[in-house]
Amino acid sequence: MAYPDFTLENKLSGVIAGVDEVGRGPLAGPVMSAAVVFTNRNIIIEGINDSKKLTAKNRQVLYEKIISVAKFGIGMASVAEINSYNILQATKLSMERALVNLGIELDYVLVDGNQPPKVKWQVKSIVKGDSLSVSVAAASIVAKVARDQLMQELHNQYPEYNWYKNKGYGTKGHIDAINLYGVTEHHRKSFAPILNSTKRALL
C-alpha cells in the first residue's frame, strides 16, 4: 500500500495546513472538517493514510498520535446550515472554521478535492490529497474520529437510528428507521431521502 508523504509540503515554504472534510453524504449529522499542521516534519507517524482506508481502531490510534505532535483545528457546519445553504457551501464553511480554530497564521493551505474554501491564505486544491499529503491525510483522520464521536453522542439520544454504526449514512437500516420513527432535528431535511420521507408523512 502506498502512503502519503511530505513531498507536497516540502515543495512549498512556510507554515502549511492540510484540510479535509467528512460527512458530506450522510442523511443525519453535521459535516465536519479538520485542519492539521505538522510544524516538525521530521516526526514520522507510521500508518497515516486516507481515513477511509483505515479501520476504526487504527484511526483512533493515529488520531491520538497526531493530536499529540501536530497543531489542529476542527470546524463544523450544522444540519440547519446544510439545509439553509447546501452541502457544498456548508462543507466550505466547516473548512473555514477548522482553519480559524487552528489559531495560527499560515502560508499555504492544502485542501483535498477541487472545491476549496475562500480563505485569506494561498490555497492549493489536490484531488485525492488524502492519499498524497500527510497533512491532508492526518486532517481526514482527525475529522473522521471527531465526527464519529459526535455521532455516538447523538446515537445515545436516538438509539433507534443506529448512528453509532451507520454514522448517519443512508443504509437500509437507517432508511427503515426513518420510515418507522420519522425524522429528527439531526436529519438533513434538504436531502432527497429525508424530503421524500417527510412528504410521505404529511400525506
Swiss-Prot record:
Chain ranges of the RNase H type-2 domain: 14-203
Cofactor note as given: Manganese or magnesium. Binds 1 divalent metal ion per monomer in the absence of substrate. May bind a second metal ion after substrate binding.
Localization: Cytoplasm
Catalytic activity, as annotated: Endonucleolytic cleavage to 5'-phosphomonoester
Main location: cytoplasm
Residues that span the membrane, as ranges: none
PROSITE patterns from the UniProt entry: RNASE_H_2
CDD domains per the UniProt record, alphabetical: RNase_HII_bacteria_HII_like (cd07182)
GO cellular component: cytoplasm; ribonuclease H2 complex
SUPFAM superfamilies per UniProt: Ribonuclease H-like
Top-tier EC class: hydrolase
Domain of life of the organism encoding this protein: Bacteria
Cofactor: Mn(2+); Mg(2+)
One of the GO BP terms on file: mismatch repair
Keyword terms, alphabetized: Cytoplasm, Endonuclease, Hydrolase, Manganese, Metal-binding, Nuclease
Chain sites annotated for binding a divalent metal cation: D20, E21, D112
E.C. number: 3.1.26.4
NCBIfam families: PRK00015.1-1, PRK00015.1-3
Similarity-based family: Belongs to the RNase HII family.
Stored HAMAP family: RNase_HII_B
Descriptive protein name: Ribonuclease HII
Organism: Wolbachia sp. subsp. Brugia malayi (strain TRS)
Organism ancestry: Bacteria, Pseudomonadati, Pseudomonadota, Alphaproteobacteria, Rickettsiales
